[in-house]
């Protein structure tokens, strides 16, 4: 291992793992991709890794545990598999960055709370909808208390694989919980829509935020703009369609000002198509989390 690099591995050679591989090669930062491990020796992801000269294995997590120099593991398998992986990785002193819905560790959104969990052995990236919308709800709640937040995420049917389709309930529950726990909303709701349009649409999100009362509109607008800029540092295709709109509406809590934000996420096109911004924001967030963890490890070694 290079002195200024931390060895990392990707567990899972499907679309998510493969896109993450390309991101780590394009922007390695303080990370050295030492292994891509899967369980299907004929998978396209492992074949692509071999073509790029990256060590591969079809032995799954056992191959990762066999290399004591691997410090960080990106788990892009399934929630069921990660339950087992989380235990084994913890026992072997490895850091797990979980891209599945398993949530065996704390929820993490890079520009919001990553710095609070740098000593955690396992962190979870929630959902694509959570990574997209939690930063904006948090941008409001850090200025004024938020009574209620609601997000509607519309993604292309082509970007929603069998895992997404089988876990719709988990998606809505986990995303809503993230809007509350990290976003700062007292109560939240999440909705996902799969759009079969062709050509495929980009990921689009509508976020409604209901503050507790009157608030400083300029301060909120500035906070949202800063948060968008923060996310764009690792997801360049993350953008608001227009400035947040503030309308007075009748709500279950009486007439209140409601903040409405329209967000679009375009992927980088590393491996997944650009319309799959919902998947790209997960792999982009994972790369960013890995980068910060690696920096933290190197600082501890140097201390």
Swiss-Prot record:
Q: Where are the transmembrane segments?
A: none
- Care to name a GO molecular-function term for this sequence? acetaldehyde dehydrogenase (acetylating) activity
Gene Ontology annotations of biological process type: catabolic process
Q: Which reaction does it catalyse?
A: acetaldehyde + NAD(+) + CoA = acetyl-CoA + NADH + H(+)
The Swiss-Prot or TrEMBL record describes its family as follows: Belongs to the acetaldehyde dehydrogenase family.
Q: What is this protein called?
A: Acetaldehyde dehydrogenase
Q: Which residues bind NAD(+)?
A: 13-16, 159-167, 278
| Residues at the active site | 128 (acyl-thioester intermediate)
* Native species: Chloroflexus aggregans (strain MD-66 / DSM 9485)
EC no. given is: 1.2.1.10
Query: Would the keyword Mitochondrion be found if you checked this record's keyword annotation?
Result: no
Stored Gene3D superfamilies: Dihydrodipicolinate Reductase, domain 2, NAD(P)-binding Rossmann-like Domain
**Any single Pfam family the record assigns to this protein:** AcetDehyd-dimer
Q: Which domain of life does the UniProt lineage start with?
A: Bacteria
Q: Which UniProt keywords apply?
A: Aromatic hydrocarbons catabolism, NAD, Oxidoreductase
